[in-house]
Amino acid sequence: FPGCMIVNRQGARFMNDGANYDETGRAMANAATTPDEPSFYIFDEHYRRNYLAGPMLAMPRLFDGTLPGDVKRIVIKAESLAELAGKLGVDPAGLEAGVARYNSFAQTGVDADFHRGEESYERHYSDPNHTPNSTLGKIGKAPFYGIAVYPGDSGTKGGLATNADAQVLDAAGAAIAGLYAAGNTAASM
């Protein structure tokens, strides 16, 4: 949805954060310098009130005082981007610069870094009423929020091993002619 981004500890986007979960998980795993290093899902009050925000539903009447304690521990809240960065262990100047760059893309509707919104999958998880790009929206209304996110599986998802052309691979790693797997039938990581 428009108005959120995923950054690293330097506060910079490093992938198309609107991509499908397989691509996102791989990008997060590849960007991590240690196996347990999180990425950070960043959004603002406008996003929180209008779209799904991790464990919080988009509920205008849901006040912070009514959030369960475990959600308050997961969702970090701050009155400024610099304060949020400090609470998350992210470089404050990097986060402010990253959000400014993302906001410039939201204004023009063109993600010059990662092309968010150019694929139909990304536009499916967007706001069709938001323009000029239904997947890019400004992050600017305090308070700001951050959630540490980690790559992982979605379900058991053993899945079939495939090559770059979605051909299923046999035990020796050779493509099986005419057999393809995609989505949840293919191994994601």
Regions found by a protein language model. Give the residues of each.
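Mobile, glycine/GP-rich and aromatic-enriched active-site lid/loop segments adjacent to catalytic centers
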Residues: 1-189
